[in-house]
Amino acid sequence: MHYMILIYGDEKNFASLLDDKKALEQLHAAYARYGADMQAAGVLRGGAELKPTHSATTVRVRSGKTVTTDGPFAETKEQLGGYYLIDVPNLDDAVRWAARCPSAANGSIEVRPLGMMSSAKQEGGS
């Protein structure tokens, strides 16, 4: 079954790492190991780091008109910073992979199963 591992954290905390080269290198190395471990286990199907929320555009269609707003829809303490798409047998396995995510120690990781239509597309269906 396909699951999204959604990585949330405080962008301010990440921004502070930019001034600490050693800490930033350690974080990048931890994520490289995490991705390599998922790849070696054959569960990784995709993933990416997201740009900061100030680069986001929210789109709404109201009364047939497209309205765009700079930034995310809602202000929150933690922002979505990246994701992984994994294919594992069950939620327990997905949670185990999420717990290994480097950001689990100081942010939060949401595990969400993909819907039936998304899973069918991932498996080569229509």
Language-model features: where?
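Conserved, structured core segments of small domains
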Residues: M1-S126
